[in-house]
Amino acid sequence: MERRVLIVESEHDFALSMATVLKGAGYQTALAETAADAQRELEKRRPDLVVLRAELKDQSGFVLCGNIKKGKWGQNLKVLLLSSESGVDGLAQHRQTPQAADGYLAIPFEMGELAALSHGIVPPGTDDTGASLDAALNGTREAPPPMPPSLKAAAGGPPKLPKRERRSAMTEEDRAFLDRTFQSIADRKAELLAESRQLKRPPPRRELMGTPEGKIQILRDELKTREAQLARLSEIWNVRERELLSGEDRIHEKDVELQGLKMQVDDLLRRFNEAQQATIQKEREHGATVDDLLLQKFSAEKDLIEVVASKEKDINLLRREVSRAEEELSRRAGELEHGRNEYDKLEKHLGVVTLEFEVKEQKLQDTVLANEGEIARLTKRGDDFEAELNRTISERDQRFAELDGEIQALQERLQQTEQERDTTVRGLEARAARAEEHGTQADAEIHRLNAERDALEAKLSQQVADLEADLARTMGERDQLRLDKDAQEAELTQRIEERDAKLGTLERELSETIARNEHTEAELNANIQQQLERIGELEGEVEAVKTHLEDRENELTAELQALGQAKDELETDLNDRLQALSQAKDALEADLSRQLEELRSAKAELEADLTGQIQALTSQLEETQRQLDDSQRTGEQLSARVAQLEDTVSQRESTIESLQGDVAARDQRISELSGDLEATSQTLAQTQQTLAQTEQQLADTQNTLASTEGALAETRGELDATSQTLQQTQQTLAQTEGALAETRGELDATSQTLAQTQQTLAQTEQQLADTQNTLASTEGTLAETRGELEATSQTLQQTHAALEDTRGALQETSDTLAHTTRERDQRIAELADLGAAKDALEQELTGQIGHLRSELSETQGNYEAERAAHEKLAAESSAHIGDLTSERDGLRSELEATSQTLEQTHGQLAATRDALAREQHAHQESRKAAASTQTTLEGQLAEARAHGEDLGEHLTLTKHELGTRVAELTQLTATLAQTENTRAHLEERLHTLTEESQRREELLQNDLTQKGTELSDTLRKLTHVTQEKMRQAEVLNREVATRTEQLKAMEAKLQTQATEARRQAEGLGQQITGLNEQLEQGRKALAGREDQLRAAGAAQQKLTAERDGLAGQLQQAEARLQQQAQQANQERADAKRAADELAAKLAKTEQRITQFAQDAQTQATEADARAKDLQGQLSARAKKIQDLELAVENAQGAKSRAEKELNAKVAAAESKAHEASTRLAAAQKERKDLEARHAKEQEDLAAKQKAELERRDAIKAQEVARLQQSVQEKSKALKVAELELARYKSKSATTATPAKAAAKPAAAEDDELAVRTQLNQVIAPAAAAQAPAPAKKPAAKPAAQAPAKKAPAPAPAPPAALSDESEPTDRTLVIQLPTAKEDDDWTALVDELDK
């Protein structure tokens, strides 16, 4: 069995949150907002734990805790005290008192602490035995027996109940009275219930009416019947209380469930927001990871390309060495063949001239031995070359295998990177799928909650339909009355709009109705004393009507006060608006001054900034031009150096055998220098492009400066026009003040219209000022400005004419506008001071305008565009002025409509007065007609009473309907505001997500564009390098052909130089001298080249700092420059070594001149062979270059394909991520919409339930009031019967003669008492309305004193008793017994309560 917890908390939402937590912990909860509600709940159902708030509205929680701990509602009742103002010290101090609580919590606290503390004080689960023991110890009442079946109605249907005063709610006094009444019959409740089930009571017998004992018996039977009805009412009351408690418990459980669902929804939203933030963070991390991977990929590709290039370079070097070894081997083979041929010739010559060369035989043998040694050496060298060749080939193959392995590793790494990227993309897709699944689950949960809510609504609707069906079955005759009530409500709804016009009529009607009712009451008390019961009912109704009219009078008084307050608020609003206009005018003038100062400061800053930019650009341009000149000089020097090197190569053909390796190295250096020259040319082109962009920026900056100066000139012109317009405005304002001084005195209703007209006029003047400020831009447009100013002046005159027309209707506004006029005078004085300050400022600006007019010629190009813009603005201003004029006309029409409405209201008031006069006349005629006959008077009184009650009911229902509609309007307004906030929040979220997606898309597009640009630059450079290599190959081919031709020419020359050895030796000496000079020139050129290379390196470093995209290439260029510097040093060493060798050879040349003729042929043959070798090398080199170009193209194609695939995959991943984010945003939006609808439906349901509970409380209060009235009647009748019985018991001791003598007076007295028992004792008559209590006591005092007086003198006792009464003793009154109609009324009342 669940423990019960009572939560006493004034804040409903906080109480629901605590109830949700405790219900989740296994407790059953109930709520109470005040201490009184908590006490009632403790009296009805004893809880196991009370969660008490110390700060309550009606009573302190500490006091209530002390009452609970004192045992007022049972012993051992646990209390958990909450406080937000006492603090820890206050709670600790209260803990030391005898009435300390069982637990304390300081607000704010965690809900988990509340659950834990509650679990520690009272465990959530106990057995049924403990519960039964607690119930037995605490005196818990058992459930009352089931409600008895309802009595059947009469055959003709239940009669109409008498009209009674409706009460809004039950009070504590009413509840105490009900408890006392039901407790008085509790001991005989079962017997009374059994008697109440009798369908029909026998009518009283006629013979019992003649004796006092019979009358007492009749009164006893009537009293017993009433007690039986009270027993049934008490049973029905208990059943209704239990139903109400169960309904409140169910509503509380539903509220707790709704609060729990709200907390779950808030938790889900929080978790969803956290998941969304985590998803966004993961997306950002993924984007950063992808960017890092792309950068790593690009860097890896770049490194791979560099490695491939270096490896190809090494391969080229190895191939060059192999080709060099092959050439050396072929040369040695040629020399060997040549030696063999010489050997054959020598043998033949030896056979022929054996005798001649016997002397030379030893020499020849030595020569043969030397040749054989040389042959052996050459053979050994050939073998070494072959071994070296084999080793080189094996190393090349091994190197190729290593390169293949590295390429394979790089490809595997690329595949692994792609796999990782695919895995990451799949992970993101999985996350997106999980997010979508989570959104689907959330949607399903929301649908389930909606379904549960719909089921609860359907169940509640079914219950409401059942209750309405029961009410419809029991209230058959009220259906027609309800239709009439609806029709009258519609009519009253239409009359609500006219209630302001009927205030005076209702007041007069109130006074006349009160006077008429009092007069009618006096006449009825004087004329129809025999109809005392009806008179009592009429008196009660008159009091009810009086109360209703007094309430109506109070309401009308409150409405008049509200109208007066609204009038005061309108006057205050008018004054505030005038002050706001003055402040706005001051703020506008201050804003104009501030804008002028800002324009001046902006101009100075802009001029300084532009001057600095121009100086920086000029210095940058000079530096760029200097670098360009240096680059050009470097290119010219390099070209001259290339030409010098080519001449040196052509001049050194005679020493080709010793300088062949140097030629190959020099060719390589020339190609590298050509590449550097091309790179320098590209850098020069880029520098020129940068220079062009800089010049364009300089031109744009100058244009901006010119436009700024033009804008400044226009602003100054506008300032002049503003000053002029200000003076005109001051004049216009002075005229307006003179005109308004004559228009004082106005009705309170039209003062607001005048203020609106003045505000419109001020706005029109402000728009005129703005238009004039805009149109006075230049002196060329001054004529157009004046024309528009005249048009505006005409419009202003029309406005003044319209204002003069309005002045006729505004003659009573002097008192209202006096204060406004004084404030306006102050503002005029301030404007005059401001005008003087502006005049001084204009004088200062006049000198500046003269200086700026010289600069106006530069802005003529922008003048036409500005003029068109000003013309457009002038058209818009004219249109706006027309709109303001139409608005003024609309206000005038509204004023006329208001006047017409006021006249119609006066007409309606007059018509209402006439109708009231007619009604009064008709009422007087009706009263005269009622005086003629008693029956006519009774009928008219019944009609008047019914009409008054209907009016009261209709007025009450109208008030309730009006309050309900106001509450609904407030609720709809709050719902609309909440919906607008939700929509604004969703729009903001959507805008944020859209901007985020656009930003990411722009970043990706920029990255893609950057990568495409880098790729295109790389391809362009690679194409350029390929073309350069082809060009160098062609140059080399041409150089080889030229050298071949030179070699052929040299062969011809060598044949002719055999006889000119001496002259050639001298020529060689001259050539050596020239070579020395060329060597010196080469050294100087190398030194200059080094300086140029250093300057080029510095320029390249600076360009590297400016162009981040060429950083890698510039680093390579620097490395090449360093290599070139090293090669230049090596070249200088080689040149020195060659010069030393040439000097040594020059010393030996004279010795070998004699052998030169013999070696000339050999050298020619060797030259031919070398030329052929060079041709073969060049062809092989061209072939290798083509292979390399093909390989580079293949690599570029593979790289482009890989980049395309990677970009496609990245784009697909980004599109999927974007689609997932779009779906997620849509899901969030749908969820928000569902939550908004769900909240709105919950609020509607709560409002309906609240209205239903209020209606039920109203019905219950009405029934309780009726029961209280009937019980009071019964109790008074019972008291009278007891007094009568006591009197008759005292009479039983007297003799028969005095009894007969006193029979007639006793009968009269009995009749009087019987009649008095039927009176309505709740509402006193008009004569005793001010003191109802004293009126009741004298009525009972004579009857109580009668027996005491009769004891000593029985015979004269009856006259003495009768002398105390107000009625004469000789009248005979007929006792009006309860009829069947009254019985049926009570039966119908009880049956209605049963249902």
From Swiss-Prot:
Which residues fall in a compositionally biased region of kind Basic and acidic residues? 919-928, 1228-1249
| Gene Ontology annotations for the cellular component aspect, listed alphabetically | chromatin; condensed chromosome; condensin complex; cytoplasm
Source organism of the structure = Myxococcus xanthus (strain DK1622)
- Every Response regulatory domain range: 4-122
Q: Where is the composition biased (Acidic residues)?
A: 1382-1395
GO biological-process terms attached to the record: phosphorelay signal transduction system
List the protein's name. Adventurous-gliding motility protein Z
Region Disordered: start-end pairs: 137-172, 874-893, 919-947, 1212-1249, 1287-1312, 1326-1395
Gene this protein is translated from: aglZ
Q: Where is the composition biased (Low complexity)?
A: 1291-1306, 1326-1352
Q: Which Gene3D superfamilies match?
A: 1.10.287.1490, 3.40.50.2300, Designed four-helix bundle protein
> Transport as a keyword?
no
Where does this polypeptide localize?
A: Cytoplasm
- Annotated membrane-spanning segments are none
Q: What does this protein do?
A: Required for adventurous-gliding motility (A motility), in response to environmental signals sensed by the frz chemosensory system. Forms ordered clusters that span the cell length and that remain stationary relative to the surface across which the cells move, serving as anchor points (focal, transient adhesion sites) that allow the bacterium to move forward. Clusters disassemble at the lagging cell pole.
Subunit structure and binding partners: Interacts with MglA.
> In this entry, which stretches build a coiled coil?
213-911
List-wise, which residues carry 4-aspartylphosphate? 48
The molecular function terms in GO held by this entry are:
chromatin binding
- Main localisation: cytoplasm
